[in-house]
Curated annotation (Swiss-Prot):
This is UPF0342 protein LGAS_1451. HAMAP family: UPF0342. Belongs to the UPF0342 family. InterPro entries: Com_YlbF (IPR010368), YheA/YmcA-like_dom_sf (IPR023378). Disulfide bonds: none annotated.
Amino acid sequence: MVNIYDNANQMAKDLQETEQFKDLKKSLENLKNKPESLDLYQRMDKLQQQILAAQNSGQPLSDDVKKEYQKINEEVRNNDELKDMITKEQALFQMINDVQQAMTKPIGDLYDDLKAK
């Protein structure tokens, strides 16, 4: 019998050897070494957490939060380190999405005979 958890753990190790993972890791190191970029990232992360908490609790976003969000987004668009990090993140998550689709295809295939034709 196959131990799927061993395979998952191996896949996690393999993920760290991919170009996409290494590129993101390098991009994050570059970001950490730029105090201005790191500060912007931390402000962006904190604001995203506030927005998520408000959404999860059904609270509307205040005008101040909306303005801060717009301001930070503009700063991010003008920050090379953050733009690079986001691009590298997207590439990594695209690869993970592709792998997830391949892994879950057999589940979808189980339902093929049930679908209306």
